[in-house]
C-alpha cells in the first residue's frame, strides 16, 4: 500500500526542484532524509518536509504495520510546473523587463521496499 504527499504552488523554479528530486528517487527513506538534511540546495528543505509528510501519511493509512523508515522507499517523485507569475522590472530608457516568477507542484509517493503478497 503506497502513500503520497503533494505540495502545490511552491515558489521555486521546477528546474531547481528537479535537481533535488533526482537525488532521492528510488532511495530508501532514511537514506533520502540523510541526503536532504546535508544538501546545500534551498529546495532540499522543501523536499524533506514533503517526504516526512508522505511517511506520516503511510503510517496513518497502515496503522497495523510498524515499519521502520529503512523499509520504505521513495517509489516515485516528480515535479510539475505550476503557475508562472509575470512581474515587471523597470529598465533603462523607459523600457520594462518581464520577470517570470515560477512555481511548481511536488508529488512524492512512498511504498514498502519489498511488498508482501496479501492475496492468499
From Swiss-Prot:
This is Large ribosomal subunit protein uL22. Keywords: Ribonucleoprotein, Ribosomal protein, RNA-binding, rRNA-binding. It comes from the Bacteria. InterPro entries: Ribosomal_uL22 (IPR001063), Ribosomal_uL22_bac/chlpt-type (IPR005727), Ribosomal_uL22_bac/org-type (IPR047867), Ribosomal_uL22_sf (IPR036394). Belongs to the universal ribosomal protein uL22 family. One of its GO terms (molecular function) is rRNA binding. GO terms for cellular component: cytosolic large ribosomal subunit. It comes from Chloroherpeton thalassium (strain ATCC 35110 / GB-78). This protein binds specifically to 23S rRNA; its binding is stimulated by other ribosomal proteins, e.g. L4, L17, and L20. It is important during the early stages of 50S assembly. It makes multiple contacts with different domains of the 23S rRNA in the assembled 50S subunit and ribosome. Gene3D superfamilies: Ribosomal protein L22/L17. Part of the 50S ribosomal subunit. One of its GO terms (biological process) is translation.
Amino acid at each position: 500500500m503506497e502513500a503520497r504527499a503533494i505540495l502545490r504552488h511552491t515558489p521555486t523554479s521546477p528546474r531547481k526542484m528537479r535537481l533535488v528530486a533526482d537525488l532521492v528517487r528510488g532511495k530508501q527513506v532514511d537514506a533520502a532524509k540523510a541526503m536532504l538534511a546535508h544538501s546545500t540546495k534551498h529546495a532540499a528543505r522543501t523536499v524533506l518536509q514533503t517526504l516526512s509528510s508522505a511517511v506520516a501519511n503511510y503510517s496513518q493509512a497502515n496503522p497495523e504495520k510498524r515499519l521502520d523508515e529503512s523499509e520504505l522507499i521513495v517509489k516515485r517523485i516528480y515535479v510539475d510546473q505550476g503557475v508562472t507569475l509575470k512581474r515587471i522590472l523597470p529598465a533603462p530608457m523607459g523600457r520594462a523587463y518581464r520577470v517570470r516568477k515560477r512555481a511548481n507542484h511536488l508529488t512524492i509517493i512512498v511504498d514498502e521496499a519489498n511488498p508482501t503478497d496479501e492475496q492468499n
